[in-house]
Amino acid sequence: MSKIRVLSVDDSALMRQIMTEIINSHSDMEMVATAPDPLVARDLIKKFNPDVLTLDVEMPRMDGLDFLEKLMRLRPMPVVMVSSLTGKGSEVTLRALELGAIDFVTKPQLGIREGMLAYSEMIAEKVRTAAKASLAAHKPLSAPTTLKAGPLLSSEKLIAIGASTGGTEAIRHVLQPLPLSSPALLITQHMPPGFTRSFADRLNKLCQIGVKEAEDGERVLPGHAYIAPGDRHMELARSGANYQIKIHDGPAVNRHRPSVDVLFHSVAKQAGRNAVGVILTGMGNDGAAGMLAMRQAGAWTLAQNEASCVVFGMPREAINMGGVCEVVDLSQVSQQMLAKISAGQAIRI
């Protein structure tokens, strides 16, 4: 089997050296070239035809975003962004994902060599995922038109969504058309700390419903979406007659914190047939067991189809486990989940 050919673009010689060490330490990939800036990278891409590009977000001569935008228009290829953990870094990274980057890794703020080498397995996994990702499914999505929701007969109704690789854009596409009369949404997207707040703020500006990073103990309200904070689990809990959010630092589940399974299991327990579960694009199996629990509790469950997924991992696992009632294209997810909530449809198996 041929190795995954990687090209790294970073203005830091140290980062280029570290990325080369990491990539070449894995037998299924190789660093074919490195470039100090996008202008040099342009020629190296033509020469080496890499399978995956790792790209620093902030660089001299040509901004990483400008280069990414041109690259995706002229020669689309899988890109993993390398980002700082700053507020500006998270905003730029979210814009990069919007432009077509598959995923991102964050630079540690202190001890870059030790920190990056500690992330070696994670970086390799993201490169492998990017190499297999569907670029066709990652074309920039046009803003969907606003949907009409049926009357929300009960504040007990809610929607739980889980996603990973490719999920930031998929979630945007699902939330943007939702009207203010939508039920509450609880969302777990695999993301590091700091990025989830920027992600929520970005969505809040684009959507009619309110979108925010979830806080421990807050009441769950219709017309609002709550994003699990990075590196913390989010669960649905009850306080008397009302739903509320529980945020905690439990151990990683399926190697993830926040974990989709943690959210889905709590929704199965607290909301049962009043919930709709949605699993979107992502690598791995997080959410599959939780979605089965939701379906067994009477919830209607949806999975994004393979054709519209950047990575058809999590939906496939949920389908194979028997937890999915319906498989739909990303363009139909918003409409279908509102229809099921309004109709009060649920299924028991």
UniProtKB/Swiss-Prot annotation:
Q: Which SMART domains match?
A: REC
Q: List the disulfide bonds.
A: none
Where in or outside the cell it occurs: the entry states:
Cytoplasm
Q: Which residues form the Response regulatory domain?
A: 5-122
GO cellular-component term (any): cytoplasm
Record's Gene3D superfamilies? 3.40.50.2300, Methylesterase CheB, C-terminal domain (3.40.50.180)
Query: One GO MF term, please?
Result: phosphorelay response regulator activity
Active site located where?
Answer: S164, H190, D286
Q: Which domain of life is it from?
A: Bacteria
Q: Which Pfam families match?
A: CheB_methylest (PF01339), Response_reg (PF00072)
Where is the PTM 4-aspartylphosphate found along the chain? D56
Q: How is it modified after translation?
A: Phosphorylated by CheA. Phosphorylation of the N-terminal regulatory domain activates the methylesterase activity.
| Recorded family membership | Belongs to the CheB family.
| Listed HAMAP family | CheB_chemtxs (MF_00099)
Domain comment in the entry: Contains a C-terminal catalytic domain, and an N-terminal region which modulates catalytic activity.
Do you know which NCBIfam families this protein is assigned to? PRK00742.1, PRK12555.1
Its recorded name reads Protein-glutamate methylesterase/protein-glutamine glutaminase
Q: What is the lineage of its organism?
A: Bacteria, Pseudomonadati, Pseudomonadota, Gammaproteobacteria, Enterobacterales
